Structure formats: C-alpha cells, structure tokens
C-alpha cells in the first residue's frame, strides 16, 4: 500500500505519549486460527447447496453456512481447496480444516427460499458468494441496521456487482437474528467466513466485489477510526499526529495508544493481503477482540465525527451506533469547536487548547455532580442531530455497536 495512509501517519512515532505506559498489542495473524470447511461435492450435490442457501436464517444456519463455505472454497476440486489454504497460510494465519455438514434436513424452515429459487447452473457460485459476503456484515452490524441495509441498499449494490438476485435475500427479523447469533466474533463459523473473504481479497478479479459488499464495510477492523482521523485532520489542515496530541486527555490515552499501534501497523503494510491480514486479526482473534473492545475508542470516534461535522453535516453519519452520555455529547461539541477555533483562528502554534479542554471538562464535571448521570444513548443521525435509539430486544443487547 503506497502513499496515502503511510505518509499521513508516518509522524505518529513522535506523538508525545509515554512509551512505558504500554501500547496496543501488535496484531499477529499467526496467533489467529482460521477455519476451512472441507468435504467432497459430487455431481448430484447441487440440491444440497441450494437447500443450504435456502436454510440461511433458520434452525440449521451453521450447517448451511458450512456447506456454502465449503462450496465456494473448493468447488468440486480438492486441489482448489489446497490452493486457497496456501493463500491463507502465506498471509501468516493458522488454518484448520473442519468437515462440512453433509446435508440439510428436508422440510426444515427455509427463510431464504425466495433467493434460492433464483439459482441456476450459471449463477449459483455468484449468488452464494454474494450471500456469504452479506452475512459477513453481521460480525459488525446490529440486527436492525442489517435489516435496513438489506431492504434499502443490497439490491442496488448487488446489481452493480452483477448479482442482482440478492434483492431476494430475506430481511425477516427472525432470520437475521438467527444469522446474527451465529456470525459473532470468536465463533468458528465467523472464522470460516473470513477465511473465504480473505481468499477473495487475494484474487484481483474479486477484490472490488469484496470491498463493495463485504470486508471493507466492517468498521470493526479499525479502519473507520483511521478514516475518521484522516478526515478530521484534513479538515483542520494538520497532521494526524498533531490532532492525536490534542485528543490525548487522560481518560483517552489508553485508547489512543491502541490507535497508534493499529495505525502504525496498517501504514507499514506493503500489500492489500498484508493489510487485511492485520485487520482480520483484530476482528477474529478472541484475545485481540477483548483487548481492543470495539467501544473502547467510542469517545475519540465521537469527537472526531463532531470535528468533521463542523465542515459537513454528512460527516456526522460517523456517529451512527456510538454510545455516549448526553453530558459527553455536549462535551464533544465543545471540544470540536475549540479545535476548529485553534486551527482556523488561533493558529497552529497555540498551546492554549489543552487548557481550554481541561477547563471545559471540569465545568461539565461540576454540572454533572448536581444531577444523576444520564443513561448512555445510541445516537444515530444523518441530519447532523443526535437521536436516541430505542434499546433492542433483550437477546440482542450484547451485540457490539458500530464504533471502533
């Protein structure tokens, strides 16, 4: 990966954070195990594949995914599977083969039956790949956001990628909940999904489709945070490292250390395969996932979005899914105003901004001491104004939000 990201973040080594305080862990693909489902397909197994497609979102979702993942990775040739495994091991991942399900029970609930009915010999592989890329989004999207994506965007996006049949993928809430329950960080089936995604990324003929429909839409990889930093820094006309210094208040230093480490690793990646190996290590490694915790950096994300929101209301779409208290939301608006004022009017050499931010924090703390702490809210906005999101049903409460 040349230019862009590497040049923008080359100065992060100079950020004034105590290096003895501990930084984010280096992401090592070799510490992450990927799963590859294997099992021979005969000439009469076409019905098994179609039944598996129809069964997505039903009681046998995991079994169905194992059949579909086995099909897209190996087709009807064991040699193809071995070649795909080599791609993953060359990226540095550990790869374990696991037997796929042998079939789907007849008469079982088939939520994706309408999609399966669009299949023929010519489009089977493309439809299955498109469905799997869509399912991969549930590693990050909430159930409600996924339903919105399917109903409003998937059909058009599928058409642009030559898979218009995806408009028939069901947005039934029960089916999406079932899929969401299977495709979560740390799950075996999720590691198999991303084994497939990574092999598609390695193929130049399918890279653009994956980037449009799958992996790059997952901001849980940390790339959203890098994008927010880049956008905010560009708007302010300053290097990302200088902006990061301003944001390193005591309460945010730990998150900042992790961000620095992630940015350094991504900026030093020399190929798209290496970059995605780093990103997927974060998504798929259970220990990494716990140490990074998707919402650890939500406060910084919120501030960055508010900064860019001063320049373009559309930038506030980056706040979608980030949970903060009303008190902190007000605080981020003040911080954004101070930073914009610093770089547009006060001047880049000013040292006043940190004192202003600290005093603002003290004022908010004093105000908060006189009233109960407000409950954290999930702000979603496409108009630049925060709106409280209703809490999802109890069995989806623990699903991660959309912040890094």
Swiss-Prot record:
Pfam families: Rhabdo_ncap_2. Its main location: virion. Residues 357-404 are annotated as: Disordered. It is found in: Virion; Host cytoplasm. One of its GO terms (molecular function) is RNA binding. Residues 391-404 have a biased composition (Acidic residues). One of its GO terms (cellular component) is helical viral capsid. Residues 357-376 have a biased composition (Basic and acidic residues). Keywords: Capsid protein, Helical capsid protein, Host cytoplasm, Phosphoprotein, Ribonucleoprotein, RNA-binding, Viral nucleoprotein, Virion. Belongs to the novirhabdovirus nucleocapsid protein family. Homomultimerizes to form the nucleocapsid. Binds to viral genomic RNA. Encapsidates the genome, protecting it from nucleases. If expressed without protein P it binds non-specifically RNA and therefore can bind it's own mRNA. Interaction with protein P abolishes any non-specific RNA binding, and prevents phosphorylation. The soluble N-P complex encapsidates specifically the genomic RNA, with protein N protecting the genome like a pearl necklace. The encapsidated genomic RNA is termed the nucleocapsid (NC) and serves as template for viral transcription and replication. Protein N binds protein P in the NC through a different interaction, and can be phosphorylated. This is Nucleoprotein. It comes from Viral hemorrhagic septicemia virus (strain Makah). The lineage of its organism: Viruses, Riboviria, Orthornavirae, Negarnaviricota, Haploviricotina.
């Amino acid at each position: 990966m040349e230019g862009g990201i590497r040049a923008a973040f080359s100065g992060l080594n100079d950020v004034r954070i105590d290096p003895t305080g501990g930084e984010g862990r280096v992401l090592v693909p070799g510490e992450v195990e990927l799963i590859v489902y294997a099992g021979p397909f005969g000439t009469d197994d076409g019905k098994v594949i179609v039944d598996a497609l129809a069964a997505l979102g039903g009681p046998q979702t995991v079994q169905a995914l194992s059949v579909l993942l086995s099909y897209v990775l190996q087709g009807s040739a064991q040699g193809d599977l071995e070649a795909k495994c080599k791609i993953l091991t060359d990226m540095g991942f550990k790869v374990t083969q696991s037997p796929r399900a042998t079939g789907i029970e007849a008469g079982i609930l088939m939520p994706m039956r309408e999609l399966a009915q669009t299949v023929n010999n010519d489009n089977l592989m493309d439809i299955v790949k498109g469905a799997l890329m869509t399912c991969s989004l549930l590693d990050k999207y909430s159930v409600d956001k996924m339903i919105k994506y399917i109903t409003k965007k998937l059909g058009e996006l599928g058409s642009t990628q030559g898979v218009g049949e995806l408009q028939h993928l069901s947005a039934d809430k029960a089916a999406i909940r079932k899929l969401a329950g299977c495709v979560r960080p740390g799950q075996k089936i999720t590691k198999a999904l991303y084994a497939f995604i990574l092999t598609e990324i390695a193929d130049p003929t399918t890279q653009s489709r994956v980037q449009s429909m799958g992996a790059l839409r997952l901001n849980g990889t940390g790339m959203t945070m890098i994008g927010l930093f880049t956008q905010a820094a560009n708007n302010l006309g300053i290097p990302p490292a200088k902006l990061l210094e301003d944001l390193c208040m005591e309460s945010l230093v730990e998150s900042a250390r992790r961000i620095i480490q992630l940015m350094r690793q991504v900026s030093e990646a020399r190929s798209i395969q290496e970059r995605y190996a780093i990103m997927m290590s974060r998504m798929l490694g259970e220990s990494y996932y716990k140490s990074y915790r998707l919402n650890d950096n939500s406060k910084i994300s919120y501030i960055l979005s508010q900064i860019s929101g001063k320049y373009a209301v559309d930038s506030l779409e980056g706040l979608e899914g980030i949970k903060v208290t009303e008190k902190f939301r007000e605080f981020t608006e003040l911080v954004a105003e101070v930073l914009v004022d610093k770089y547009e009017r006060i001047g880049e050499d000013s040292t006043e901004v940190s004192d202003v931010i600290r005093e603002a924090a003290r004022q908010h703390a004093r105000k908060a001491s006189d009233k109960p702490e407000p409950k954290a809210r999930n702000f979603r906005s496409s108009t630049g104004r925060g709106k409280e999101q209703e809490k999802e049903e109890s069995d989806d409460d623990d699903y991660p939000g959309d912040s890094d």
